[in-house]
């Protein structure tokens, strides 16, 4: 799993991660 020491680190990482996948994998998050 992920070892994230600070909440904001996860938030920023996920934000970038989501932005990269948004166009191609948007459906996975929307269901």
Curated annotation (Swiss-Prot):
Record carries keyword Transport: yes
Residues that, per the record, bind Fe cation: 25
InterPro entries noted in UniProt: Haemerythrin, Hemerythrin-like_sf
Tissues expressing this chain: Muscle.
GO MF entries: iron ion binding; oxygen carrier activity
Key words of the record: Iron, Metal-binding, Muscle protein, Oxygen transport, Transport
Keyword Metal-binding: yes
Cited function: Myohemerythrin is an oxygen-binding protein found in the retractor muscles of certain worms. The oxygen-binding site contains two iron atoms.
Family statement: Belongs to the hemerythrin family.
Subunit structure as annotated in this protein's UniProt entry: Monomer.
Record protein name field: Myohemerythrin-2
């Amino acid at each position: 799993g992920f070892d994230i020491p600070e909440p904001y680190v996860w938030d920023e990482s996920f934000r970038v991660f989501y932005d990269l996948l948004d166009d191609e994998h948007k459906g996975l998050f929307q269901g």
